[in-house]
């Protein structure tokens, strides 16, 4: 923890790393562990674990490096860079002609010295030849973790480093042992990892650290000390203790982190560096071990039933799922303020030359990697009719229109009026007072109201080249904003329509989280007061009126849905070797489901929305259910619900199970989820067994007859059942730990190799220099946006890192404005800063301060504390501006919220799709809403007698 927080009080040891430098700390620990437990000695427990469950033994081809970095030969011979995984289809071996051969990565077998293709990769997950072979059983194969000792030579590999203060790339070259296979130089992932982490072995050429005390090169303890301020000796000791504990306990070492890790621009690299520590030491898939991401109420244990009910998959498929970060980045015009190009975040490889991040998003959308709605610049409701008029199938018509340019993706012209969002409904989400990264841009471009944006738009040389860029940018795109909530927030104040909602104590509902292994119920203590309604009744009322209006306005229409290439489907094998080819440039043909989104026509009877909402649709019986690639036959469950809930009479849902009440819906979710229905859990595991060829269904068999009902949860919280919906086993009463099924039952991870992967070989990731974990510092906001350099002082105060952690005086994002919480804190918004920074700008505790950057302005009370590190301030999140927020000296208007000083920035690697584990699915993968890299000027207000 960078500050002396509550968790520090209870810790045996405090590691006070500077904000945003956790990746450097983790990499230096990895350096020590790799050297002492993989090179100086080999630990049988670590060796066996990594042979079975990680990609360390898998082969990677080296490619000639023709960049300037590769030309800078230091005497080590020709330069190479890490390339693609070696797969069966690359080699002259019997498996090269097998089904999905380009999706079956290879290893070297220590017994024979030859190439082997182990079971378990994604190539075995799909197709006829993979039945019974999608498992982690190595059989007679003994994978070599390293070719050192059996190598035919060495090769000099050029590796990027980003640890300069400005974040710019430089390079270091190091030798790796190699073998030649089919004309390729190959090495293993472990061999590349050792080079990346600066762990030298005998005979390896290149630039290497002289020891742990060498600060000149990445990953040594001394190197990280200059970045994190954590003493090198402490890191060495902790790394040894971590590895020794893993050996002694069989992998019971855990890294627990908060959501803040996810909020840095380079969050993926922080995570990957941490995951190295847990995975190479055999801690993943263990009770008491692994990687625990503390994110709160975001895991829906009965996910299967929830998804099918929430997204109306019982009536129509596919759904339109969207990632919010990209949606708001586009529709609040924040992309126009990117005063940098995508080149600024790559490794000098030229993979993004001349492109902005918005160009890459548009490419990702048109290749089917990530969703974008509205999809096209014409209504999806007219395209099928146009196709009929042209005598073409709708999918063929859309492809033809796209290739001729007559139809475009909306993301390629986002400021065109026909591509704007028009209606936004907020359901228990305080978007405009809490969660909107870049809040002032929302006010400016989405609502067209007062805002504090002073940022300059991108100059011509920094603008995207593949989208339309009108000089005049719209302000106020929405026509209607509706909010359903039980409390007053900024969002309700900005809304055109507010529908009052029942609280948790006035409705029936079910609740599960990733923090506990139970299903809970909410039960009303009183009926919803006055005009308020429960969620279900409120949306029923909206659906009923909508259906009535649709008789005259919409009727029945055919809708062309563009769906991205989904994870856990064969669509994740669309991009062979992760090589990016764009149909727009003629590199490949536009093929829906491979180089384009999947195009599906859905017939929608808009007059029947209410009928469909209040009954379970026929697709559950005619098609069944599918969750995480596992099919389920739920005819039995639907029939049970007919008897339990009754059936609808008349209308679209005639004869189908009713969903008239919130209890009906809760029971439907519980009956249609393996975690709450033992029959479905057992049935699902039996289906998985057909593909894996390994026993699994016994994990749920003890509960095959168990059905958790809503009435059960009203009596007491009920433990859930082990199910294919999740990766952990709770069989026999044990507590849930992720990936225990993968480790104990040899079920593959849902990745390219079927293992935990340290190496990523997609073109974009290789181009960014992130094939392996690498330290990438917080973004340099001075270089990118012209903000004052950290630590500098001027008339506006002092420049500091601006972080927005979870609030100390609220309950998550609510009740900050509760009288008890206000009394415990300062009565309104506050900013924590160190006594050192306070002295620099003449601030005393409880003074009014203003924080100002290009994104907005905040006016708040100062909390001066020695627990805060110099150079960093905290404004706890979800401090809405409803109470005790004065007018600012900066512009004379009301101060902002914690997200008024932030904005959305998207990392290109987060919008990759169509490639094994790097494939889209809702709430699984996508760009993060990062805001931790931000900086601000903070100063004492000259007038402490504030006005409201």
Give residue ranges: language-model regions:
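Short, well-ordered beta-strand core segments
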Residues: 14-16, 424, 481, 498-500
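Long, contiguous, secondary-structure-rich segments that constitute the structural scaffold
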Residues: 392, 537-601, 612, 622, ...
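Long, well-ordered, tryptophan-enriched scaffold segments
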Residues: 8-248
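Short beta-alpha connecting loops at secondary-structure transitions
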Residues: 11-17, 518-529
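Extended redox/cofactor-interaction regions of prokaryotic respiratory oxidoreductases
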Residues: 155, 161-201, 208-211, 226, ...
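Flexible loop/turn segments at secondary-structure boundaries
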Residues: 4-8, 22-23, 234, 245, ...
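Flexible glycine/proline-rich, aromatic-decorated loop/lid segments
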Residues: 6, 495-522
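Phosphate/diphosphate-binding loops
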Residues: 478-480, 486-487, 524-547, 850
């Amino acid at each position: 923890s960078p500050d002396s927080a509550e968790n520090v009080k209870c810790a045996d040891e405090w590691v006070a790393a500077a904000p945003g430098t956790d990746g450097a700390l983790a990499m230096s620990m990895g350096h020590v562990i790799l050297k002492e437990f993989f090179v100086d000695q080999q630990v049988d427990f670590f060796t066996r674990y990594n042979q079975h469950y990680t990609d360390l033994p898998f082969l990677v081809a080296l490619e000639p490096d023709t960049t300037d970095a590769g030309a800078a030969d230091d005497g080590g011979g020709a330069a190479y860079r890490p390339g693609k995984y070696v797969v069966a289809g690359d080699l002259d071996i019997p498996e090269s002609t097998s089904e999905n051969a380009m999706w079956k990565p290879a290893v070297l077998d220590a017994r024979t010295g030859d190439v082997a293709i182990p079971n378990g990769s994604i190539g075995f997950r799909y197709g006829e030849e993979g039945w019974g072979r999608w498992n982690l059983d190595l059989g007679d194969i003994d994978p070599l973790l390293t070719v050192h000792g059996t190598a035919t030579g060495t090769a000099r590999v050029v590796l990027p480093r980003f640890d300069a203060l400005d974040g710019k790339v430089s390079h270091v070259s190091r030798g790796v042992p190699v073998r030649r296979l089919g004309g390729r130089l190959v090495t293993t992932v472990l061999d590349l990892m050792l080079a990346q982490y600066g762990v030298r072995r005998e005979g390896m050429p290149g630039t290497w650290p002289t020891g742990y005390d060498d600060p000149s090169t990445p990953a040594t303890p001394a190197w990280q000390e200059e970045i994190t301020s954590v003493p090198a000796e402490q890191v060495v000791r902790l790394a040894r203790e971590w590895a020794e504990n893993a050996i002694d306990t069989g992998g019971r070492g855990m890294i627990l982190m908060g959501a803040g890790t996810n909020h840095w621009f380079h969050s993926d690299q922080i995570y990957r560096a941490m995951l190295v520590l847990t995975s190479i030491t055999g801690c993943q898939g263990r009770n008491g071990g692994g990687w625990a991401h503390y994110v709160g109420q975001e895991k829906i244990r009965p996910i299967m039933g929830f998804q099918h009910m929430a997204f109306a998959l019982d009536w129509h498929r596919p759904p339109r799922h969207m990632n919010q970060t990209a949606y708001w980045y586009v529709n609040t015009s924040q992309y126009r303020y990117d005063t940098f190009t995508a080149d600024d975040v790559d490794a000098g490889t030229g993979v993004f030359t001349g492109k902005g991040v918005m160009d890459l998003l548009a490419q990702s959308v048109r290749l089917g990697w990530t969703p974008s709605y509205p999809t096209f610049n014409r209504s999806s409701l007219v395209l099928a009719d146009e196709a009929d008029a042209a005598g073409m199938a709708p999918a063929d018509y859309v492809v033809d229109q796209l290739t001729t340019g007559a139809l475009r993706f909306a993301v390629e012209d986002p400021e065109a009026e026909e591509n704007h969002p028009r209606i936004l409904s907020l359901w228990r989400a305080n978007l405009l007072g809490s969660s909107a990264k870049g809040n002032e841009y929302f006010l400016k471009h989405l609502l067209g109201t007062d805002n504090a944006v002073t940022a300059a738009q991108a100059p011509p040389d920094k603008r995207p080249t593949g989208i339309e860029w009108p000089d005049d940018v719209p302000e106020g795109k929405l026509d209607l904003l509706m909010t359903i909530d039980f409390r007053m927030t900024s969002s309700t104040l900005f809304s055109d329509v507010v529908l009052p909602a029942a609280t948790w104590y006035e409705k029936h509902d079910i609740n599960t989280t990733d923090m506990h292994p139970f299903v809970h119920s909410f039960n009303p203590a009183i009926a919803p007061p006055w005009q308020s309604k429960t969620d279900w009744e409120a949306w029923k009322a909206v659906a009923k009126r909508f259906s009535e209006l649709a008789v005259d306005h919409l009727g029945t229409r055919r809708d062309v849905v563009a769906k991205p290439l989904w994870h856990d489907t064969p669509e994740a094998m669309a991009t062979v070797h992760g090589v990016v080819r764009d149909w727009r440039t003629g590199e490949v043909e536009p093929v829906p489901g491979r180089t384009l989104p999947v195009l599906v026509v859905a017939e929608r009877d808009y007059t029947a929305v209410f009928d469909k909402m209040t009954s379970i649709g026929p697709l559950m019986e005619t098609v069944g259910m599918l969750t995480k690639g596992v099919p389920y036959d739920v005819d039995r469950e639907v029939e049970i619900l007919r008897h339990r809930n009754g059936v609808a009479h008349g209308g679209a849902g005639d004869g189908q199970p009713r969903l008239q009440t919130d209890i009906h819906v809760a029971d439907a979710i519980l009956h249609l989820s393996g975690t709450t229905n033992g029959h479905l859990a057992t049935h699902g595991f039996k289906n998985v067994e057909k593909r894996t060829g390994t026993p699994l269904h016994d994990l749920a068999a003890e509960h095959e007859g168990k059905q958790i009902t809503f009435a059960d949860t009203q009596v007491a919280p009920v433990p859930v059942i082990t199910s294919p919906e999740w990766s952990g086993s709770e069989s026999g009463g044990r507590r849930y730990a992720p990936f225990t099924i993968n480790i104990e039952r040899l079920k593959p991870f849902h990745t390219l190799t079927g293992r935990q992967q340290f190496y990523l070989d997609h073109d974009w990731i290789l181009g960014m220099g992130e094939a392996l974990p690498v330290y990438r510092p917080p973004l340099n906001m001075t270089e990118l946006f012209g903000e004052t350099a950290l630590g500098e002082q001027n008339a506006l105060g002092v420049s500091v890192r601006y972080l927005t952690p979870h609030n100390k005086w609220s309950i998550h994002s609510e009740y900050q404005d509760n009288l008890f919480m206000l009394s415990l804190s300062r009565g309104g918004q506050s900013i924590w800063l160190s006594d050192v920074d306070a002295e620099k700008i003449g601030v005393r505790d409880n003074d009014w301060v203003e924080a100002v950057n290009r994104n907005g302005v905040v006016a708040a009370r100062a909390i001066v504390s020695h627990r805060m590190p110099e150079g960093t301030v905290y404004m706890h999140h979800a401090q809405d501006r409803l109470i005790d927020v004065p007018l600012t000296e900066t512009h004379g208007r009301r101060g902002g919220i914690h997200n008024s000083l932030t904005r959305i920035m998207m990392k290109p690697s987060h919008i990759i799709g169509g490639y094994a584990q790097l494939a889209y699915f809702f709430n699984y993968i996508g760009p993060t809403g990062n805001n931790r890299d931000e900086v601000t000027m903070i100063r004492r207000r000259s007038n402490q007698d504030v006005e409201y």
